[in-house]
Amino acid sequence: MEQAIKQLRNQQKQLDQQIEQQKQTLNSLISRREEVTKGIQTLELLSGTTLVPDQQIHEALQPAVSESTKGNQEIKTWKQIFDEEHELTREEKIDATVGQKKKAYVIFDGPWKGIYQDWHIVKSKVNAQPYRYKGYNSLEEAKLAHKQAYAEVTKADEVKVEKTMKSFAKNNVAEKIHGLHKSGPKELTEAEFYRNWKMITEWTEESANLGFYPDCSKQVKAVFFIGADPHLLSSFYQSGLISYIYLQEDEGQKGAISKATSQLPKELRRTCQQYQLSFAKTREFYLAIQSTYPVFDEEKMLVPAKHLVKLGISASSYPENKIVKTNFNFSLFINSVDKLYNYIRQYGTTIKGFKVLMKTQLCLAVCLIRDQAEESSKIMVMEFELDISTLTGIFSNLPKELKKATCEKMHRYKSHLCESCEINFPELSETMNVSNDEKRSTKSVSSDEINLSAENDGYQHS
């Protein structure tokens, strides 16, 4: 009997502990609900709108309410309502502050400071940004106000901020990129590649606040500058869609490379850092990039982009903004492989003075020097170009038909020889007799030796 009583008391003690835990949980929920209620009241005052009444929220929490009384109407959370109303209120506030009846507008801060006559453009640039702006009744008033403000913060001979790419270093463009990953770089997807392609081919002036503009004079590419978002820059780099990147020492941080490079491959990022410390210092420098486009199959990346990167000091002369509206096709991929190989093979032939700063399977970084290239640099160039000339390495994953089409394009180079090549040996003459001794003395040549000799034919790195 005593044993049974002891067991029941233990059960009672356990139940008491569970009840106490539930009380603590309930008190925590009540406390959180009170905080939410205060948040609702605060937001109602800020937005000037009527949100879901507190009594309705309380009733919705009661288990006695049946599902049939709710109907099919969707009940939005206070956060959803606030987000919608706040966005609307923000635009209405801008319209009310400046208005659309003015004839000219001035933006005093940020990369887009200047005079505008289209209110919609002004609103797109100042919305959700801490920029000062004002509307004027005449263009003359706007010009006078802009001139006075400009004289206060700049020297007379300084170039206007909106006319130089350095302006983007002063603006946190990352806030304008929504939906991009905040973690480290990850493998590019096919959907992301086509999104980037569309961002170039359908670029508008309003898109410039993302930190790039199109450079489609030779291929579909983009030029990125100092304040570009690191994740967007990394995505375009993996897409093989960059022709130039302009970088400079971070403002206020001596020796620190631009944050735009933070999501690039670590080897390339380290090379940029070393180049800045050794050569560029506080000057603006560039990365001139020649790349192949990646190849996908059912969302999976078969062949990543391969890059040749040349680093140099900027002369403040930038590529022309040129848009070409075209869709991606595999002939563009084939041309990108051909162009990359044509650029690489110049190092050691027509370009004598260069130095290889970094080499990986996907990237070769070089800079031009006065002296002739060292033998080690020439060897690295030959190693890097080998999988292009033979369509091996990363290009071994190309679909059969695409590899064959790429092979046909590469036939113009004597150094090209791949498994898709058709080798036509000369027919033996009927009168040609080879003795057994001569046959035995003939050395067999392996396929590797054929590839090597074909690669070196007509392309000597002197």
Swiss-Prot record:
InterPro entries: Ribosomal_bL9/RNase_H1_N, RNase_H1_N. Residues 433-462 are annotated as: Disordered. Pfam families: Cauli_VI (PF01693). It comes from the Viruses. It is found in: Host cytoplasm. This is Transactivator/viroplasmin protein. Residues 443-462 have a biased composition (Polar residues). Enhances the translation of downstream ORFs on polycistronic mRNAs derived from soybean chlorotic mottle virus.
